[in-house]
């Protein structure tokens, strides 16, 4: 995982402020002025503990995504929420993910001794495509009725491949748990979004992770949220 300017500066013997950081996919335009204004307007609240239920935030996110706040759980960045998701994935016989993959996925899966395997995306003339070996293994899993999990990010990091929503539908039909990391979805025009948030209510085996880090350029705020069945989120919160 990139973005550790203090560490890089110590190696280069310079100030972190002079380093141009290309190691993390953060929006180069910086945080929205409205976000900075909101932070400044609430500085006085730093002396008080926040609401542990984050009800105002959950309500605002619920209005934005048109979903009940009980289906939303804010976290200490998407990384914390991915950790809890990987704990649930570790309960499956095996979890698959497309590779190359964001390094934090392997970290979180290993933390719970999850059995997992990668399926390589293959470079083709018009972009990166799902390998035939994955399709064959998927058919074997269907035949053996194994308890299988799947973890993917959409758009995919680092290839930039955007998967159609129909791929997730196919996964939901035969995977015990599907976790979709949509950290980069907001970089797309709304007309090109392939988010599956609107399917969560009909699919208890679906978890969607969102982040304010990448598009809104707020990595220091450490804010992400999960959208999933309330029973799962209550278990995570405990």
Regions found by a protein language model. Give the residues of each.
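Short loop-beta-helix segment that forms the pyridoxal 5′-phosphate
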Residues: 50, 62-84, 98
């Amino acid at each position: 995982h990139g973005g550790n300017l203090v560490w890089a500066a110590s190696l280069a013997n310079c100030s972190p402020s002079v380093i141009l950081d290309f190691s993390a996919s953060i929006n180069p335009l910086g945080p929205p002025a409205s976000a900075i204004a909101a932070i400044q307007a609430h500085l006085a609240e730093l002396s008080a503990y926040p609401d542990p239920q984050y009800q105002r935030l959950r309500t605002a996110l619920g209005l934005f995504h048109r979903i009940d706040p009980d289906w939303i759980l804010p976290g200490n960045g998407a990384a914390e929420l991915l950790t809890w998701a990987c704990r649930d994935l570790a309960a499956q016989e095996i979890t698959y993910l497309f590779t190359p993959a964001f390094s934090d996925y392997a970290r979180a899966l290993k933390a719970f001794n999850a059995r997992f395997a990668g399926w390589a995306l293959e470079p083709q003339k018009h972009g990166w495509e799902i390998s035939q070996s994955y399709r064959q293994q998927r058919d074997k899993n269907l035949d053996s009725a194994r308890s299988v999990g799947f973890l993917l990010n959409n758009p995919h990091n680092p290839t930039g491949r955007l998967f159609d929503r129909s791929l997730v539908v196919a996964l939901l039909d035969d995977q015990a748990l599907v976790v979709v990391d949509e950290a980069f979805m907001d970089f797309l025009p709304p007309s090109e979004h392939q988010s599956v948030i609107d399917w969560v209510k009909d699919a208890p085996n679906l978890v969607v992770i969102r982040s304010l880090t990448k598009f809104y350029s707020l990595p220091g705020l450490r804010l992400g949220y999960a959208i999933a069945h309330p029973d799962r989120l209550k278990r995570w919160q405990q």
